[in-house]
Design a protein with these regions (language model features):
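Non-catalytic, surface beta->alpha helical segment in thiol-disulfide oxidoreductase systems
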Residues: 75-108
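A short beta-strand-turn-helix
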Residues: 6-24
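Residue-level signature of catalytic and energy-coupling elements of molecular machines
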Residues: 13, 26, 43, 60, ...
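Structural microenvironment flanking redox-active thiols in thiol-disulfide oxidoreductases
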Residues: 61-68
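Short, Lys/Arg-enriched N-terminal segments with co-localized hydrophobic residues
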Residues: 1-2
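Short pre-active-site segment immediately N-terminal to redox-active cysteine/selenocysteine motifs
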Residues: 21-22, 29-32, 75
Length: 108
């Protein structure tokens, strides 16, 4: 089982997200969150179909409280698109695949 999504932590955040030469779609989630579980397969499809044009990263807010606080995550799932080290788009709650894809396209 190969993860198309990257596990993002405080340790690799700068390298994988801020210094990325490609846009990064970040998913702030928790294992106990119902909508996050619904969103997971959608994000997995998006990651597999990205063909390397962008990256998809997942941040477990229970394990990465520092990052959750840094980005003021009050409600999950929260999706943030980063480009050139800056957050350029954000959405909270479950979103259909088409909306997420459009969000990422807008950052390319």
């Amino acid at each position: 089982f190969l993860m198309a999504e990257l596990k993002i932590t405080a340790a690799n955040f700068e390298n994988e997200v801020l210094r990325s030469d490609k846009p990064v779609l970040l998913d702030f989630y928790a294992d106990w969150c119902g909508p996050c579980k619904m969103l997971a397969p959608v994000l997995h499809e998006i990651a597999e179909e990205s063909t390397g044009a962008f990256k998809v990263g997942k941040i477990n807010v229970d394990e990465q409280m520092e990052l959750a606080m840094r980005f003021q995550v009050s409600s999950i799932p929260m999706l943030v698109v980063f480009k050139d080290g800056k957050a350029v788009a954000k959405s909270v709650g479950y979103r259909p695949k088409s909306e997420i894809a459009a969000m990422v396209e807008g950052a390319r």
